[in-house]
Amino acid sequence: MAAAVAGSLVDKLVCLWRQPYTRIYLPHLFFCISLVGSVLKNAELVPESYFSSSRNVLNLYFVKVSWGWTIVLLLPFIAYSNFYIKSHMFALRRLTSLLVATLVWYICTETFFYIEDITGSCYESNTMVVIRGEFDTKAACRKAGFFWDGFDISGHSFILSYSSLVIMEEMVPMLHIQPAYRNPPLDCLYLALNVIVAIWIWMFGCTSVYFHDIIDKILGTSCGILGWYMTYKVWYVKLFSPGLPPQPKQHT
């Protein structure tokens, strides 16, 4: 019974993702959410809610470790779906895309931290009247109980858009596997990935309407989209790369 319900949900999700506009317009959706959310935030049109606090459950247990969730779910899905369709060697090659994605995530987040450190100052409080010059990094300042003010590119906007787009690309094999050849483990992984994407998009929207300035969010979102584009649309189509997930023409 449970397997039948899962299979039915997978069929509906596959139909959704098969629509060309779903995958084509997802990057545009993130930009639109950032812009509209920022306008709403500046106009103070969105009331405070549970999600306006950074202590909400989704932020604490999902977004704060978002890359961990992405890797934990994508690793078995890529291995299983790519091996199921192609071969061991193809699956191993495709798994290197997770190493590349992790490198992109690490470089971008560390760069954001560095920029915030070199552009910021430590203050005794958020009134930013008394400066504490003995602290030259955000980490040291915050550890001492003070307030750091620097150019804070939105890491949430980056990681949530980037993770969603990477997952979108890696779920492509499910669009072309006939239902008769699927199995419960693969269906469950696919459902979990779709749930995670839904959470990422929702929390991306919450970030847009409750946190950061517009430039912080646009830069973070741009980095996420650029990281996805330069890998999946530029590098992975070339021979010496992790390659793309199995595409429609590869399924016979």
Curated annotation (Swiss-Prot):
GO BP annotations listed: cytoskeleton organization; endocrine pancreas development; fatty-acyl-CoA catabolic process; glucose homeostasis; lipid droplet formation; lipid droplet organization; lipid homeostasis; lipid storage
InterPro entries the UniProt entry points to: FIT (IPR019388), FITM1/2 (IPR046401)
Reaction catalysis annotation: an acyl-CoA + H2O = an acyl-4'-phosphopantetheine + adenosine 3',5'-bisphosphate + 2 H(+)
Localization per record: Endoplasmic reticulum membrane
Domain of life: Eukaryota
Active site residues of this protein: 156, 212
Residue ranges that the UniProt entry lists as topological domain Cytoplasmic: 1-25, 81-94, 178-190, 245-252
Membrane topology: Multi-pass membrane protein
Physiological role: Fatty acyl-coenzyme A (CoA) diphosphatase that hydrolyzes fatty acyl-CoA to yield acyl-4'-phosphopantetheine and adenosine 3',5'-bisphosphate. Preferentially hydrolyzes unsaturated long-chain acyl-CoA substrates in the endoplasmic reticulum (ER) lumen. This catalytic activity is required for maintaining ER structure and for lipid droplets (LDs) biogenesis, which are lipid storage organelles involved in maintaining lipid and energy homeostasis. Required for lipid droplet accumulation in liver and intestine during embryogenesis.
Family of this protein: Belongs to the FIT family. FIT2 subfamily.
Protein name listed in UniProt: Acyl-coenzyme A diphosphatase FITM2
Record organism: Danio rerio
